[in-house]
A protein has these predicted regions:
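Anionic N-terminal interaction surfaces
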Residues: 1-30, 47, 100-123
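Generic hydrophobic, helix-prone segments enriched in Leu/Val/Ile
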Residues: 9, 15-16, 37, 89, ...
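Phosphoinositide-binding peripheral membrane targeting modules
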Residues: 17-71, 75
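Charged/polar, solvent-exposed surface patches and flexible loops
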Residues: 56, 91-95, 114, 118
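Alpha-helix boundary/capping detector
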Residues: 61-62, 80, 115, 119
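Short, surface-exposed secondary-structure junctions/capping segments
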Residues: 62-70, 95-111
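Canonical phosphoinositide-binding patch of PH/PH-like domains
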Residues: 72-95
Length: 123
């Protein structure tokens, strides 16, 4: 039986985890201790990320609209999630982590431009 790290849940919403090749649909529990994801098919297939182990959390922003996909950077690696309520999740994360750890991710054009610039940079 999966035990939640959270004592108080601030937000419960549906979403998708892209940890494997196929996305897993499930529920997010955002609370006082951790960001948690529980798959719908198998509750024992879960991801618990304590707030203390998160280095950064970010999403793409276009104008004033936050995309549904967001990434969580931790000690263990990078986790990719999607939720219709990603803006609410990021607001709660900003309260728990601070403004410096919630970032705006670069767009595809910015990544390509950086790669091209590095190709022609003097070494």
């Amino acid at each position: 039986m999966a035990q939640s790290l959270n004592k108080v849940v601030d937000l419960q919403t549906t979403g998708t985890s892209y940890l494997s090749i196929q996305g897993k649909v499930g529920k997010f529990l955002v609370g006082d201790q951790a960001l948690e994801f529980y798959a719908d098919r198998n509750v024992e297939d879960y991801i618990q990320i304590p707030w203390s182990s998160i280095h950064q959390i970010g999403a793409n922003v276009s104008g004033r609209k936050v995309s549904r996909h967001f990434e969580v950077f931790t000690d263990q690696g990078k986790f990719l999630f999607a939720s219709k309520d990603s803006g609410k999740i990021l607001k709660i994360a900003r309260k728990k982590l601070g403004n410096d750890k919630v970032v705006k991710l670069p767009t595809l054009l910015q990544i390509i431009g950086r790669k091209i610039k590095n190709l022609f940079a003097k070494k």
